[in-house]
Regions:
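Feature captures the FAD/FMN-dependent oxidoreductase FAD-binding
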Residues: 73-144, 320
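Beta1-alpha1 glycine-rich phosphate/pyrophosphate-binding loop at the start
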Residues: 6-11, 15-99, 207-208, 271-277
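Glycine/threonine-rich phosphate-binding loop and adjacent beta-strand/alpha-helix elements that clamp
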Residues: 51, 338, 342-410
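Short hydrophobic core segments
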Residues: 11, 130-143, 180-183, 326, ...
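C-terminal active-site-capping segments
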Residues: 397, 401-483
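Rossmann-like dinucleotide-binding core of oxidoreductases
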Residues: 2-5, 9-10, 15, 19-20, ...
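Short beta-strand to alpha-helix junction loop
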Residues: 70-88, 100, 183, 253-262, ...
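Alpha/beta-hydrolase fold catalytic core
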Residues: 267, 272-328, 332-335
Length: 483
């Protein structure tokens, strides 16, 4: 089998993989690397999801790259605009020729004899080959791109209309004048409902339980003022700092004073929807704020749709699908031409690759994460896992920066291997992510764990991580250099 040698192998050409490539171009210009992408186009999430209204659920000042300002006045950005931003970034940093599309890594094995990762690569066209890489950065995201999560609905096949899955949206679906049911209460559902309601005959948002929803302007007035008086980069940096601090504050207060934030969010919803709307049934969850991710709606678009005659919300369980729609547990029959099961993601670690160390399969659930990016006792591997309580890209950027610093440190020491060493798994660990979202709870058995103390604790706090990752010392008693 033909073999290629690289310094760095990046797996995944989405937001994280592109960002890692840009960091290498800027900070390690002599490094040989390739970005392998299994799909036919780059962009990851922002190319895969094409449902109506697809947009960011974080502001683009923190969701955009630190090194490349987001210049659109809309800081809650439509998906196509984000995809354009990614493609422009690829061209600006000369990554187009380094990205190999329709090229899947199926197996990844660390060879201690060679001090290299050996990746088995399957291009859609051409022969299978191997890549021997000094360092691997997994930027595959956290969910299965081929299959979303779909509960077993009784009578699912009885429905005679169209079932449109958000993860695989039918390109030719015309929903104008149609009756639509959107099942779900998360970010996807609250995005789809107001968009489809613009032209559909009626949209019903059917949720098993409510989520916290936070309305904010689609255009940041503070950033808008800064852009008028400052150069783009300064306006971007200051807006970014403001939003980072604001998100950390909101999350911190939500954890310390959940009742205060709950009352605040309830008041905002009541102010938007009016006293006659049953906010407590539909927008007042039983869990605390930020125990699950807060759903962002720009300019109150979901509330506006619900106040119109084109959309309504039902909080109930699905009993079964029928030929003409579905029936809820309370007995309500809801007719529809189209049903959209916005029921969540299916977690997948490492893009489904079979990972092994010296031919011994790696079960990451029995390992801790080091600084939220490396895996205990696994050499020369970084896994980009962004924030779930803030913008994903903030952590992806820190990870990319750290990988570059770590490679430079290895060069200075004249070594080929670096491993975060752990003698034994501690008796007490934490979940990698603090959120209690269903898709994360379902996947707890397949994710690495967080320790209780640094550097094994996954802080999920940008300021703490920045100090640790960007400015922390390598000689911390954990990282072992050798080879």
């Amino acid at each position: 089998m033909q073999r290629e040698n690289l310094d760095v192998l990046i797996i995944g050409a989405g937001l994280s993989g592109i960002g890692q490539g840009c960091h290498l171009v800027q900070k390690r210009p002599g490094t040989t690397f390739a970005i392998l992408e299994a799909r036919e186009r780059l962009g990851g999430t922002w190319d895969l999801f094409r449902y109506p209204g697809i947009r960011s659920d974080s502001d683009m000042f923190t969701f955009g790259y630190r090194f490349r300002p987001w210049k659109s006045p809309k800081d809650i950005a439509p998906g196509p605009d984000i995809l354009t931003y990614l493609n422009e970034t690829v061209d600006e940093y000369g990554l187009r020729d380094r990205i190999r599309l329709q090229t899947r890594v199926t197996d990844l094995n660390w060879s201690s004899a060679e001090n290299r990762w050996i990746a088995t690569v399957h291009p859609d066209k051409g022969d299978t080959y191997e890549i021997a890489a000094r360092f691997v950065v997994s930027c595959t995201g956290y969910y299965n791109y081929d299959h979303g999560y779909l509960p077993e609905f009784e009578g699912y096949d009885d429905f005679k209309g169209v079932i449109a899955h958000p993860q695989h949206w039918p390109e030719d679906l015309d929903y104008a004048g149609k009756r639509v049911i959107v099942i779900g209460s998360g970010a996807t559902a609250v995005t789809i409902v107001p968009t489809m309601a613009e032209t559909a005959a009626h949209v019903t948002m059917l949720q098993r339980s409510p989520s916290y929803v936070f309305s904010r302007p689609g255009v940041d007035k503070f950033a808008d003022i800064l852009r008028r008086v400052l150069p783009w980069r300064w306006a971007y940096k200051l807006s970014r700092v403001k939003n980072v601090l604001l998100s950390i504050y909101l999350y911190s207060v939500s954890q310390r004073k959940p009742d205060k934030i709950r009352a605040y969010l309830r008041k905002l919803a009541k102010d938007e929807l009016g006293e006659d709307f049953d906010v407590d049934t539909h927008f007042n969850p039983t869990y605390g704020p930020w125990d699950q991710r807060l759903c962002l709606i720009p300019d109150g678009d979901l509330y506006k749709a619900l106040k119109s005659d084109r959309a309504d919300i039902v909080t109930d369980h699905v009993e079964r699908f029928t030929t003409t729609g579905l029936r809820t547990k309370s007995g309500q029959e809801i007719d529809a031409d189209i049903i959209v099961p916005a029921t969540g993601l299916q977690i997948q670690f490492g893009g489904g690759m079979a990972v092994s160390v010296d031919n011994q399969p790696l079960d990451v659930a029995n390992h801790l994460v080091y600084r939220g990016m490396m895996v205990s006792n696994v050499p020369n591997l970084a896994v980009t896992f962004g924030y779930t309580n803030a913008s994903w890209t903030l952590k992806a950027d820190l990870t990319a920066d750290y990988v570059c610093r770590l490679l430079t440190q290895m060069d200075k020491r004249g070594v080929e291997v670096v491993t975060p060493k752990l003698d034994a798994m501690p008796d007490k660990t934490q979940a990698l992510v603090g959120l209690q979202s269903g898709y994360l709870l379902r996947a707890s058995h397949m994710l690495p764990k967080s320790g209780l103390e640094s550097p094994w604790k996954n802080h999920e706090n940008y300021i703490s991580d920045m100090m640790s990752i960007r400015y922390g010392k390598f000689d911390d008693g954990v990282l072992a250099f050798g080879g």
